[in-house]
């Protein structure tokens, strides 16, 4: 485990620029500071789509560690971003010290970015601060999702972390339309009404497309988990937010992945 007080702090950075050139989306600039890096571009679709894996080689973040990810998707480019693994947040090495992650993503006119959902696993005594900012053009296509777990449940760690503080901001045509903060502290009894209402897993998705409507979402989610709770909000024209509460990690993960696949197919193939 990297939580030893003798280990150096890691400050990973990943800067990626994608552009459409000669009819193909290309990764035209990449700056990587370990432990963050990116895979080579993969192409598995008939449509123009550049797929990359976002890699974190240290196995997790420790208090005092920081991660900064900045991704630019230029006009007409199409990108799929797949985290290689869950974000594991190790225990704080000293009181009041947190690990941090900052994400910035810009999706320009007619461009598309699909960020596949992955889990955040806060270990016992972990403190995690996350800030995520998206800049979208009204003609762009975008998907982002994640799942917060109660901890390492197979090690009998449920809600033993110090805090998870996550802020999402979304700008649509340079106007701030979303400022959404989720700040969870287990000492505040997360499973009471107004927190997690007795559930252990929390999932969230943000998605945008020019012709996206609530009716599309209702069709994709008509067979939602019987024992889960979910709701959606049409935040702005073409921008929808979905939240889940679940007692099953595999069921919530399946729901997130099913929605991701449905939206991706809709956006790329019009199906």
Swiss-Prot record:
Pfam families: UreD. GO terms for cellular component: cytoplasm. InterPro entries: UreD (IPR002669). The keyword Aminoacyl-tRNA synthetase does not apply. Keywords: Chaperone, Cytoplasm, Nickel insertion. Its main location: cytoplasm. It comes from the Bacteria. Belongs to the UreD family. This is Urease accessory protein UreD.
């Amino acid at each position: 485990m990297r939580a030893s007080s003798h280990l150096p702090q890691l400050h990973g950075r990943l800067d990626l620029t994608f552009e459409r050139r000669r009819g193909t989306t290309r990764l035209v600039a990449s700056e990587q500071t370990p432990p963050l890096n990116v895979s080579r571009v993969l192409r598995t679709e008939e449509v123009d789509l550049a797929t990359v894996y976002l890699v974190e080689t240290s196995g997790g973040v420790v208090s005092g560690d920081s991660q900064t990810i900045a991704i630019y998707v230029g006009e007409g480019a199409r990108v799929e971003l797949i985290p290689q693994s869950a974000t594991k947040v190790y225990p704080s090495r000293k009181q009041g010290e947190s690990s941090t992650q900052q994400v910035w993503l810009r999706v320009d006119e007619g461009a598309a970015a699909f960020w596949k959902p992955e889990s955040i696993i806060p270990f016992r005594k972990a403190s995690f601060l996350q800030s995520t900012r998206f800049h979208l053009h009204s003609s762009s296509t975008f998907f982002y999702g994640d799942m917060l777990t109660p901890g390492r449940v197979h090690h009998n760690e449920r809600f033993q972390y110090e805090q998870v503080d996550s802020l999402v901001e979304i700008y649509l045509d340079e106007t701030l339309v979303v400022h959404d903060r989720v700040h969870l502290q287990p000492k505040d009894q997360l499973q009471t009404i107004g927190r997690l209402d007795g559930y252990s897993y929390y999932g969230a998705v943000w998605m945008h497309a020019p012709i996206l409507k609530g009716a599309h979402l209702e069709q994709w989610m008509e067979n939602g988990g019987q024992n889960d709770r979910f709701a959606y909000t049409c935040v702005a024209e073409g921008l929808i937010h979905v939240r889940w509460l679940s007692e099953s990690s595999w069921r919530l993960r399946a729901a997130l992945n099913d929605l991701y696949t449905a939206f991706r197919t809709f956006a790329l193939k019009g199906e």
